[in-house]
């Protein structure tokens, strides 16, 4: 199944049913009076987080969704039936954005969580409602109100405790295969991983965490090189980042320089994400003579000015992987306890999470704007005159850019 993490859809809630105008007409009953019923409310549109879904592909081709209208009122004071609500299932971790205002309507982060994105129209009133002491036979009714309609952008960010960073062929997929039951494709060429992969790491019988592997970054990713930085958004909700470095690259490149590339690209994408706790994992150390390993480790730590934890592993032979998994589990438990006991720390983390979300969304929007400029033949914003209506929302002749990552 294709992995789709961004879609645009249109939702329309049901209109309210019109009120009914009718009068009681029975044999031997004169001037029976009004008996027109109210209409039914229109159905609303909800998004519901479904833990069995992991992609937005269902909304790639079907983009317009309408809830049921309310039925009109009936005679004998019968109220029209309410329109049926429309419930659209989405993967857990979906962010819902109003396209018109760029406002984040909500995040669906728990299975079964529901979010109303379009409210059904209010029912119309039947003529019975307007009966009074001075108006015994009202002929007034009201129509149902139209339901809300919205253009929405759905963004999926995978939910994981730990995220893996590194250049292509750094061994991220091999690492996730070594520590979990996930089986991502592994090969000796760049960009083997094209979509995020999730793996559940079981440390003890009742202790586990989720790790996410995203496609590798290369130098210039922030400008769109390689697979770009679009997949970095999937690390926004992680609690810890593991920076994997290939210590024995086939092209004999400098591991320290390769690690610095990732650090620089991460900072360009989101300075707040670069503040997330990060551990350095030196992979493929089994290919380095044992008497040289400590010196290699000390050299890269010194050149990077690294202050955080450093681990030496060999993912393919699983050397050192059990230790790092237990340390990760301990880190996550201590972090959760501190959040529960220290409100100041919890607030600081919440602010950091919000900054990461805001910066990631702004950066990705900037990339989409640049792509739109290039496709329109404009090289840069400086080439647009002040009187140019390129960004005029009322100009229907402008290009429409819809980005979907397969």
UniProtKB/Swiss-Prot annotation:
Sites where the protein binds GTP: 166-173, 191-195, 213-216, 283-286, 314-316
Keyword entries, A-Z: Cytoplasm, GTP-binding, Hydrolase, Magnesium, Metal-binding, Nucleotide-binding
Residues of the Obg domain: 1-159
Bias (Acidic residues) ranges: 383-399
Polar residues biased stretches: 129-143
Superkingdom per UniProt: Bacteria
Pfam families: GTP1_OBG, MMR_HSR1
Any one GO CC term of the record: cytoplasm
Annotated positions binding Mg(2+): 173, 193
Broad EC category: hydrolase
UniProt function note: An essential GTPase which binds GTP, GDP and possibly (p)ppGpp with moderate affinity, with high nucleotide exchange rates and a fairly low GTP hydrolysis rate. Plays a role in control of the cell cycle, stress response, ribosome biogenesis and in those bacteria that undergo differentiation, in morphogenesis control.
Sequence similarity: Belongs to the TRAFAC class OBG-HflX-like GTPase superfamily. OBG GTPase family.
Designated name of the protein: GTPase Obg
Naturally occurring in which organism (per UniProt): Ectopseudomonas mendocina (strain ymp) (Pseudomonas mendocina)
Lineage: Bacteria, Pseudomonadati, Pseudomonadota, Gammaproteobacteria, Pseudomonadales
């Amino acid at each position: 199944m294709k992995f789709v993490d961004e879609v645009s859809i249109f939702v329309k809630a049901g209109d309210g049913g019109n009120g009914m105008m009718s009068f009681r007409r029975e044999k031997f009953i004169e001037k029976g009076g009004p008996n027109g019923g109210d209409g039914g409310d229109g159905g609303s549109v909800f998004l519901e987080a479904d833990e069995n879904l992991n992609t937005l592909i269902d909304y790639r081709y079907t983009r317009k969704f309408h809830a049921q209208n309310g039925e009109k009122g009936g005679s004998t004071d019968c109220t029209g039936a309410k329109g049926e609500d429309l419930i659209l299932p989405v993967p857990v971790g979906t962010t819902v954005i109003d396209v018109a205002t760029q406002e984040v309507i909500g995040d669906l982060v728990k299975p079964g969580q529901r979010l109303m994105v379009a409210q059904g129209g209010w029912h119309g009133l039947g003529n019975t409602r307007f009966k009074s002491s001075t108006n015994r036979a009202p002929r007034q009714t009201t129509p149902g109100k139209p339901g809300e309609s919205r253009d929405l952008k759905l963004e999926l960010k995978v939910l994981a405790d730990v995220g893996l960073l590194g250049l292509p062929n750094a061994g991220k997929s091999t690492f996730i295969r070594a520590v979990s039951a996930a089986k991502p494709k592994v090969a000796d060429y760049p960009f083997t991983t094209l979509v995020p992969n999730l793996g559940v790491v079981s440390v003890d019988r009742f202790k586990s965490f989720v790790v996410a592997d995203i496609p590798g970054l290369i130098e210039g990713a922030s400008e769109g090189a390689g697979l770009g930085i679009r997949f970095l958004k999937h690390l926004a909700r992680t609690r810890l980042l593991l920076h994997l470095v290939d210590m024995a690259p086939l092209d004999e490149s400098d591991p320290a320089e390769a690690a610095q590339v990732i650090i620089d690209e991460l900072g360009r994408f989101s300075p707040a994400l670069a503040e997330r706790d990060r551990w350095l994992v030196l992979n493929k150390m089994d290919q380095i003579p044992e008497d040289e390993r400590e010196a290699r480790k000390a050299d890269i730590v010194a050149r990077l000015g690294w202050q955080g934890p450093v681990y030496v592993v060999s993912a393919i032979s699983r050397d050192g992987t059990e230790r790092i998994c237990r340390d990760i589990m301990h880190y996550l438990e201590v972090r959760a306890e501190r959040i529960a006991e220290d409100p100041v720390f919890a607030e600081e983390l919440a602010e950091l999470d919000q900054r990461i979300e805001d910066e990631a969304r702004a950066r990705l929007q900037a990339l989409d704007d640049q792509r739109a400029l290039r496709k329109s033949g404009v090289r840069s914003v400086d080439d647009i005159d002040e009187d140019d209506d390129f960004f005029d929302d009322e100009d229907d002749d402008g290009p429409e850019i819809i980005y979907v990552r397969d």
